């Protein structure tokens, strides 16, 4: 048997930072889903146009995915993940307060674009942390995404059942999620991903 390698405090902190990003990523996206029928009804959007509007989400992700690698090389996976997670969750406020269909479309597109950038960057950072642990831990991060999605769905459902206005739910959720996303930065590994010294950071 091989001995379990020592894990530094910095690596442990970074693991919790990545966990927080994965949890937020799942929670933010799922929190608005229970309110979609109300939004659709409020804006008087028929089924055909609603389907096209929701299709903007994968389009936003596709467009954002084209530039993610370049952004990570320029700024680091930690910075890209945190900044675009904050941007993505902030779009909840735009979605929840949309008074016309184009505002909702913009919110859906931008949230999905930020989500795609975050998804790639937080996985890249998770791989950095995994290298410090010297054992597979990446799957556990995806487990936390699933937990976040369940929590977000429950949050949205509870707000709906409790009669909380959509705009208020989204405003509070966006504010709280942005603070949490920015707070994750202090936990993550410093330096650029391609910097050998940064990759070994663990003290």
Regions found by a protein language model. Name each.
Residues 7-41, 109-110, 203:
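Pair of pore-lining "gating" transmembrane helices in MFS-fold secondary transporters
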Residues 44, 76, 97-102:
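Helix-breaking motifs and short loop linkers at transmembrane-helix boundaries and internal kinks
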Residues 107-144:
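Cytoplasmic helix-loop-helix junction between adjacent transmembrane helices
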Residues 167-186:
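Symmetry-related core transmembrane helices of the 12-TM Major Facilitator Superfamily/SLC fold
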